Amino acid sequence: MFKQISKSPLCFRLENTGARKLYLSAGIHGDETSGPHTLINLLKEPEFFDDLDVTIFPILNMYGHKHNQRHNEADKDLNRDFKSQKEKETQDHIKLMNDRYDIALCLHEGRDADGVYIYKPNKNKRLDVMESILKAMTLQMPIDDRHKRMHSLVEPGILQDVKYKEMHETEAIYLANRGVDAFTIEVPHGYSMNVREKTLRAGIKQAVRILS
């Protein structure tokens, strides 16, 4: 059973001593709703995680989530704050990130996307893990094809995080810089909530299989 270990930010832990560790987060951009929806539902399904040790942050930007806006109350993008750590939400979040996770998935939505894709931090070399998770997600929806001509494209559906993100440190980059196999998975906002949730669950379940 998941236990709540913090109210601000919301954080839940499924503790299994000695097991491999999975980190999941969503809602750092308040107008991206399928990630929080998916993780809140998964909190009711501890059996989904096959005896892993799991940490879940379902809604990292509570103000943005309540007001359906990307930024926090101070109009700051929390996913560009991990280098400076100026925002209280980021400071409180980092205090709870005290484990060496085996895999970390940061759940996001792409507003203009037409399929799934993954952002790869520079420090993360585990393309095999990303490819496996992306493949599982594509059973629910196609790979986004907007990035074919972008220099940041590593391979179809996997993009290198750009220098701006590396400079300011997104959540995934912060984790990757500390030795975690972390990356951002994105689903398109234009699909129904049901399909977005199924796609995110498929990616998470593949991460569970990799670690089990």
Q: Where on the chain are the PLM-derived regions?
A:
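Structured catalytic-domain cores with a bias toward divalent-metal coordination
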Residues: 1-212
